[in-house]
Amino acid sequence: MGLETEKADVQLFMDDDSYSHHSGLEYADPEKFVDSGQDRDPHRLNSHLKLGFEDVIAEPVTTHSFDKVWICSHALFEISKYVMYKFLTVFLAIPLAFLAGILFATLSCLHIWIIMPFVKTCLMVLPSVQTIWKSVTDAIIAPLCTSIGRSFSSVSLQLSQD
């Protein structure tokens, strides 16, 4: 990794048709210049938390405070929201992420190894249980209900007003 003393010979060939005399900034995608950081909420799970000062504090037209008070309270609101969020995430984000990971791992394990095998077993057994239940219903419960229904169908009530 020493000092290079040789000259590099570089040439660039461009067609006149493909060469644009514009800088290209006016044609660029504006989203590339907004924020190059990753989107931490791609599914918009917390879109309801995007609250501004005007969403929380609102003065009607008839009652306005002094402009300096409004500006200072707006600045204090934004700064305190920013600082408190950073402070809370420093102390709570890692432990809560750890606990959430344990919780979701436990729930996943229970779902995969206990709940789904139980459900699949029940679904495998249910056709035979259904056949047995239908036989019991046809042999015992249906005749019993039929005889009770016939007994009560012969009962008649007569009301008289005396």
UniProtKB/Swiss-Prot annotation:
The name this protein goes by in its record: Caveolin-2
Gene Ontology MF: a single term: protein kinase binding
Residues where Phosphotyrosine is found: 19, 27
Family as reported in the entry's similarity comment: Belongs to the caveolin family.
PROSITE patterns: CAVEOLIN (PS01210)
Organism of derivation: Callithrix jacchus
Top-rank taxon, per record: Eukaryota
Gene Ontology process terms (BP): caveola assembly; endoplasmic reticulum organization; insulin receptor signaling pathway; mitochondrion organization; negative regulation of endothelial cell proliferation; positive regulation of dopamine receptor signaling pathway; regulation of cytosolic calcium ion concentration; skeletal muscle fiber development
Higher taxonomy: Eukaryota, Metazoa, Chordata, Craniata, Vertebrata
Gene (UniProt): CAV2
Pfam families: Caveolin (PF01146)
Keyword list, A-Z: Cell membrane, Cytoplasm, Golgi apparatus, Membrane, Nucleus, Phosphoprotein
Post-translational modification note: Phosphorylated on serine and tyrosine residues. CAV1 promotes phosphorylation on Ser-23 which then targets the complex to the plasma membrane, lipid rafts and caveolae. Phosphorylation on Ser-36 appears to modulate mitosis in endothelial cells. Phosphorylation on both Tyr-19 and Tyr-27 is required for insulin-induced 'Ser-727' phosphorylation of STAT3 and its activation. Phosphorylation on Tyr-19 is required for insulin-induced phosphorylation of MAPK1 and DNA binding of STAT3. Tyrosine phosphorylation is induced by both EGF and insulin (By. similarity).
